[in-house]
């Protein structure tokens, strides 16, 4: 999820 958070 943290990775996707970077994408927005």
Swiss-Prot record:
The keyword Calcium does not apply. GO terms for biological process: neuropeptide signaling pathway. Signal peptide: none annotated. It comes from the Eukaryota. GO terms for cellular component: extracellular region. Keywords: Amidation, Neuropeptide, Secreted. The keyword Secreted applies. Its main location: secreted. The modification Glycine amide is found at residue 8. It is found in: Secreted. Mediates visceral muscle contractile activity (myotropic activity). Belongs to the kinin family. This is Kinin-2. It comes from Periplaneta americana (American cockroach). The lineage of its organism: Eukaryota, Metazoa, Ecdysozoa, Arthropoda, Hexapoda.
């Amino acid at each position: 999820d943290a990775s996707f958070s970077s994408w927005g």
